[in-house]
């Protein structure tokens, strides 16, 4: 098939939000790189906004706009204009406060959408998006790319047998203007792989905080335990997994290691989702990750007192917690 025919056959993908480097990286993978697992997708249009008032995001928009234009992306003036030009959407806006209204427009249009992290700036809006997704029968998913770290995926697939526990050391800088809940801005990169490794079913959470780090201890409904050490002044991704069955003297499994793959594992999952309509992670699981983060924040504010997932959801909505599962 010649290049012109390939362009005609490609799924047209659009970006909402050019305030994150993800937008540029995803465009490069789809439009420039020759990754066979992403073949059949092309980024064709972008709506730049995006945060309106988070400086660390807004100051990127002019530069990233020019970069995606050089890769063949048309810049449009509204979300509605974007939706009219594409088959699928990557909602990349770095500001989770904007996601509720932006996602609803895509849901209404019936277009499949990947909502990049964070799904929302707090659990309240995450629950609203979850409800809207159900109401519209929307095809969507949201995740941190660290869910697709090879070892995390191997653990989730059962390659190491039943997982007894895991402990992760992760960076968790804050959004300096205070627009997001404590962990939704960046700390999600720790919570997401921990749930990937351990599976769903977090029951209760304790969190202890000082000026530079938080230690989150979580207990699953079956009694297993996982831990996060979230650092605000130490930029490292590390951790280990403890399988239930391990030979005596054998070291724990290291979760993260250097990889040249970058965002490709995530974009491959997005491509598969756009082609099949089957999300690699369910909205229910994403919601549990958000409730996990909210419970940790509530616990930290109470000096480490345990908080249940059900309590975190109840504090963010008038609906009963079980309505969301």
Where are these regions (language model features)?
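A contiguous active-site-proximal alpha/beta segment in oxidoreductase catalytic domains
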Residues: 119-177
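Short helix/strand-capping hinge loops at secondary-structure junctions
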Residues: 110-112, 117-118
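C-terminal helix-rich "cap/oligomerization" subdomain common to oxidoreductases
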Residues: 89-93, 273-325
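N-terminal glycine-/serine-/threonine-rich beta1-alpha1-beta2 phosphate-ribose binding loop
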Residues: 10-109, 131, 135, 200, ...
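Rossmann-like dinucleotide-binding domain that binds NAD(P)(H)
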Residues: 167-236, 284-291
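Hydrophobic alpha-helical targeting segments used for export or membrane insertion
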Residues: 1-11
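C-terminal substrate-binding/catalytic lobe of Rossmann-fold NAD(P)-dependent oxidoreductases
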Residues: 213-266
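Hydrophobic residues in well-ordered beta-strands that form the structural core
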Residues: 77, 115, 140-142
């Amino acid at each position: 098939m010649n290049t012109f025919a390939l362009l005609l056959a490609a799924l047209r993908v659009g970006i909402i939000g050019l305030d994150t480097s993800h937008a540029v990286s995803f465009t490069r993978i789809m439009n420039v790189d020759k990754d066979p697992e992403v073949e059949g997708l092309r980024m064709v249009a972008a709506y730049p906004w995006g945060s309106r008032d988070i400086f660390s995001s807004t100051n990127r928009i002019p530069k990233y706009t020019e970069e995606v234009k050089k890769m063949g992306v048309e810049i449009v003036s509204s979300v509605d204009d974007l939706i009219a030009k594409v088959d699928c959407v990557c909602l990349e806006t770095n500001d989770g406060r904007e996601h509720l209204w932006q996602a609803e427009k895509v849901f209404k249009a019936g277009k499949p959408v990947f909502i990049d992290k964070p799904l929302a700036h707090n659990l309240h809006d995450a629950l609203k998006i979850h409800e809207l997704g159900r109401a519209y029968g929307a095809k969507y998913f949201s995740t941190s790319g660290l869910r697709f770290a090879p070892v995390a995926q191997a653990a989730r697939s059962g390659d190491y047998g039943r997982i007894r526990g895991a402990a992760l050391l992760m960076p968790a800088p804050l959004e300096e203007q205070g627009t997001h809940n404590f962990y939704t801005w960046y700390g999600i990169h720790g919570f997401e792989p921990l749930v990937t490794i351990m599976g769903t079913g977090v029951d209760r959470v304790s969190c202890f905080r000082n000026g530079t780090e938080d230690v989150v201890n979580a207990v699953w409904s079956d009694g297993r335990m996982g831990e996060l050490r979230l650092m605000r002044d130490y930029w490292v991704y590390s951790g280990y997994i403890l399988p239930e069955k391990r030979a005596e003297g054998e070291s724990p499994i290291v979760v993260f290691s250097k990889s040249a793959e970058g965002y490709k594992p995530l974009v491959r999952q997005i491509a598969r989702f756009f082609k099949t309509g089957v999300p690699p992670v369910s909205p229910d699981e994403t919601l549990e990750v958000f409730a996990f983060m909210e419970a940790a924040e509530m616990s930290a504010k109470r000096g480490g007192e345990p908080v249940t997932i059900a309590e975190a959801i109840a504090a963010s909505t008038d609906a009963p917690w079980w309505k969301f599962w």
